[in-house]
Amino acid sequence: MILPNINPIIFSIGPFSISWYSLSYVVGILLGWFYATKIIEKFKPEITKKHIEDFITYAIIGIIVGGRLGYVLLYNPLKYFANPIEILKTYEGGMSFHGATIGIIISAYLFCQKYKINFLSLTDIITTVVPIGLFLGRIANFINCELYGRITNSSFGIIFPNSDLEPRHPSQLYEAFFEGLILFCILAYAVFRHDTLKKQGLNSGIYLIFYSLFRIIIEMFREPDIQIGFILDSLTMGQILSAPMLLLGSYLICRLNSK
């Protein structure tokens, strides 16, 4: 299958333009906010709808700043240190999920300190809605023909425009399905069938474990970033950065089981 060359810009009006990537962020945040408020209405945890509304600004800053700096520092530092002004061009792409995770964790911590609420209670809500953004973000990656997979002879192979014209795994769709749709369903099942919000840190632990496992496995099909390549012969940066998430998620679950 040959993927058509889709314009990454949906439309432009003068200097103003909307890209698929930016649209995925906006829609993801709005849907996440809507879903979080519905969960709060039903289960009435410590976190209120007002808290979520106030946290959105913190979340946006954490995602954008953390995601961009994470990409700059972890994936292409030499390029951006040579041309620092390029760091500000987020509209050209180049965001790190792991960097965004650190950014939103810091934002959540500062928010909880200001409003005197439990940190894990907030992250339990956040992690429940994150798969929505992950799904939309990976679909945008697919449309933009970026972050594609390794060369394959399987029937899943897709020829991406502006590439080497070899059939490759559509790893963006694998991630959208597992890290987005499947993880969303797992967390929704945990919340609505087992009321996991009653145990602070449980949802966060479930999310961290499943996301990191899915990411580590799918990285086996994803082409490593060209400027980094493989680390220690066979590992990718995504796998290495996901390992601490797996350990932290396991710790949160074990911590609850030991009580």
From Swiss-Prot:
A 1,2-diacyl-sn-glycero-3-phospho-(1'-sn-glycerol) binds at R138. Pfam families: LGT. One of its GO terms (molecular function) is phosphatidylglycerol-prolipoprotein diacylglyceryl transferase activity. Belongs to the Lgt family. This is Phosphatidylglycerol--prolipoprotein diacylglyceryl transferase. One of its GO terms (biological process) is lipoprotein biosynthetic process. PROSITE patterns: LGT (PS01311). It comes from Rickettsia typhi (strain ATCC VR-144 / Wilmington). The chain crosses the membrane at residues 9-29, 55-75, 92-112, 117-137, 172-192, 201-221, 228-248. Its EC number is 2.5.1.145. Keywords: Cell inner membrane, Cell membrane, Membrane, Transferase, Transmembrane, Transmembrane helix. InterPro entries: Lgt (IPR001640). It is a multi-pass membrane protein. Its main location: membrane. It is found in: Cell inner membrane. It comes from the Bacteria. GO terms for cellular component: plasma membrane. Catalyzes the transfer of the diacylglyceryl group from phosphatidylglycerol to the sulfhydryl group of the N-terminal cysteine of a prolipoprotein, the first step in the formation of mature lipoproteins. Pathway: Protein modification; lipoprotein biosynthesis (diacylglyceryl transfer). PANTHER family: PHOSPHATIDYLGLYCEROL--PROLIPOPROTEIN DIACYLGLYCERYL TRANSFERASE, PROLIPOPROTEIN DIACYLGLYCERYL TRANSFERASE.
